[in-house]
């Protein structure tokens, strides 16, 4: 799984991109059946306000600016899509859903999700939120608790899966059948 491939006609790619750029994402975020703190977390990612190391440095905090998983500068785009560890996580998800590529950015995620899971639009935001939250939690464990570096992307994916199951628990029984 290497990067992003051009698939379909230019027109279909453009339509997918335009659809992804509309306010549809904001509606999906606030209507998603995920905890409010996760909705706020995802919104902070969207507006580049999560306190990654580069954002902390911009605020004057003196810290190592490198990613907890790799030796590259830690930005939102890098942490959630560009890091070697997170690329591997997205590759695992791609294999599970039968995709031949993985998203390389937040914007590409929406086109990718619409292409490979067109019948499951209600879970696009939930899946993205679970993976991003799992990456963030693992990053924070390394950053704040000084645990050994995570060498297993499967731990991140298992953590994301547990979030999805946990978040689905308080849902009504009618909605639960669509989650499992």
Located regions from the model:
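Charged boundary/loop elements
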Residues: 1-180
